[in-house]
Every structure is written in C-alpha cells, then in structure tokens.
C-alpha cells in the first residue's frame, strides 16, 4: 500500500482529513451513533481507548462527544503529521501497527479500535497486526475492527460493482486477501473470547439521507484514485484506461443512482 500512502501525501493532508471526516459522518449515521459496537460499559468513567490509524482523531472526538462521563483517549498513526496542533485532551503518538507497541501501553487499554486501515498490513496481512493489538488490552478489554466488504458487496450499479471488483483484486494482489470477512476468525485465532461480528449497510449518494449526500460521495470516492494506482501494480482484470475512468464513473453513479457498501465490524475480548 506504499503507492496509496505516497499518492495521498501528494494530494495533501487537508483534503484527506476532510474526506475522513465526511466518511466518519456517513458511518456514524449507518451505525445510528453507536461507534463503539463492542459491549464496553462506557457509563463507567475512566476507560482507556486507543484509535490506531487515527489521522486527526476524528473518530475519537466523535466518540467522546457522545459520552456522559469522562474517558481517556489515545490516537496513534504512522503519519504523525496528521495529528491536530491542539490535542484537545487526546494523547497522540506516532506508531505503525506493524511494529511492537511501546512498553507503557502493554496491558493498558479497555478498547483498541481500527477502521479502514488494515489493508496497510500488506504484505504480511492483518493476522500479526491483530495478534499485536491484543498485547495492548487489559484483561476484559476489547479489540474492534471495521472494514469494507469488497468480496461480497451489496447489489449496486455497474460502476460501484467495478469498484468492489477492483478493490478485491487489489487486496488479493497485495497479499491481504478477503480480510474484512476473515477478521472475526483472526480475532479468534489471536486468543480473544466472546468474538462477534456485525454487518452494516452504508447508503451513499442518492441513497443516503439528503444531508449526507455530498459527504457520503466524497468519503468513498476520495481514495479511489490512490487505490487504482495500487491496482496497477498487481494482477488486475482492468485495463489502464478502465482504471482511469473508474473514479468519475463511481462519482456519477452515486450522484444519480446512489449505492451501498457493507462494513463488517468484528470485535473480541481478552480473557
């Protein structure tokens, strides 16, 4: 996924942060405001919560805004440049989830969250990353993973269908495979208990609520150009011309017909 990261950098951090905020609002609506799906008792104050791949902490701030009691929030990202200048009570630290976690955070967290980042585990794949995440948990703590299902997506128009096919071929080519559908079993293999899975349909464009029409399109279409750049480096059924045309096709289809993606949320608890 180095091509994806490099192209995202070239496009600039601010557009990517705006896209992530748009996507967060879209997911928040699909989840009916319940961003913490794992059954962690958030009514009890002082929970320690880590968002890995946090960017500017949008998910953490959104979670915090919904709570009636205080918790301790931490955000990590391989790109420390994305962290906000004002941390606003959130602890940020630069870290790649491929690397061993800092000693002070081992056995420290009640919840460790990742959303939309596990493709970055290539070429080794998510299994060692997930195993690594379990070292961060207190006894009784939870890991929650949320990723897009590109391999068995909901019915859509031809452009969104091609988008899912392109993504599935790209995930296969970089070595992560059908990880969204396999995260549940990987949590089990990592030794977690009470492992569960929730699937959520996210409406986009014309199928979204009117107030989320533009945001949902922006959130999903933003990464297509960088993703197609990765797709060019692996075995693909698409020609270069078809990959060039895909971003505009998806945007037009979402604006005129709408579309859907399925997000798979897998979560498990440390004994």
UniProtKB/Swiss-Prot annotation:
Pathway: Secondary metabolite biosynthesis
Swiss-Prot/TrEMBL induction comment: Expression is induced under hypoxic conditions.
Annotated knockout phenotype: Abolishes the production of pseurotin.
Gene3D superfamilies cross-referenced by the UniProt entry: Vaccinia Virus protein VP39
EC number: 2.1.1.-
Record's keyword terms, sorted: Methyltransferase, S-adenosyl-L-methionine, Transferase
One GO-annotated biological process of the protein: methylation
Gene Ontology MF: a single term: methyltransferase activity
EC class: transferase
Family assignment from sequence similarity: Belongs to the methyltransferase superfamily. LaeA methyltransferase family.
Function: Methyltransferase; part of the gene cluster that mediates the biosynthesis of pseurotin A, a competitive inhibitor of chitin synthase and an inducer of nerve-cell proliferation. The PKS-NRPS hybrid synthetase psoA is responsible for the biosynthesis of azaspirene, one of the first intermediates having the 1-oxa-7-azaspiro[4,4]-non-2-ene-4,6-dione core of pseurotin, via condensation of one acetyl-CoA, 4 malonyl-CoA, and a L-phenylalanine molecule. The dual-functional monooxygenase/methyltransferase psoF seems to be involved in the addition of the C3 methyl group onto the pseurotin scaffold.
Protein name in UniProt: Methyltransferase psoC
Record gene name: psoC
């Amino acid at each position: 996924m180095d091509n994806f990261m490099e192209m995202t950098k070239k496009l600039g951090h601010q557009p990517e942060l705006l896209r992530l905020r748009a996507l967060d609002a879209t997911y928040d609506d699909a989840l009916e405001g319940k961003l913490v799906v794992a059954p962690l008792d958030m009514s009890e104050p002082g929970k320690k919560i880590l968002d890995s791949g946090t960017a500017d902490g949008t998910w953490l701030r959104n979670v915090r805004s919904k709570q009636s009691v205080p918790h301790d929030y931490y955000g990590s990202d391989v790109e420390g440049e994305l962290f906000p200048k004002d941390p606003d009570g959130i602890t940020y630290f630069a870290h790649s989830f491929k690397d061993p976690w800092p000693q002070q955070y081992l056995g420290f967290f009640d919840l460790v969250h990742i959303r939309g980042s596990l493709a970055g585990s290539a070429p080794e794949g998510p299994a060692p990353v997930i195993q690594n995440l379990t070292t961060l948990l207190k006894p009784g703590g939870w890991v929650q993973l949320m990723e897009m299902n590109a391999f068995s997506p909901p019915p859509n128009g031809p452009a969104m269908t091609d988008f899912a096919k392109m993504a599935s071929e790209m995930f296969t080519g970089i070595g992560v495979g059908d990880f969204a559908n396999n995260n549940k079993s990987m949590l089990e293999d990592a030794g977690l208990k009470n492992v569960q899975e929730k699937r959520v349909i996210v409406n986009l464009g014309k199928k979204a609520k009117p107030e989320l029409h533009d945001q949902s399109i922006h959130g999903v279409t933003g990464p297509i150009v960088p993703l197609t750049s990765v797709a060019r480096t692996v075995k693909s059924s698409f020609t270069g011309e078809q990959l060039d045309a895909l971003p505009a096709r998806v945007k037009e289809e979402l604006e005129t017909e709408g579309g859907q993606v399925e997000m798979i949320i897998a979560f498990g608890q440390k004994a």
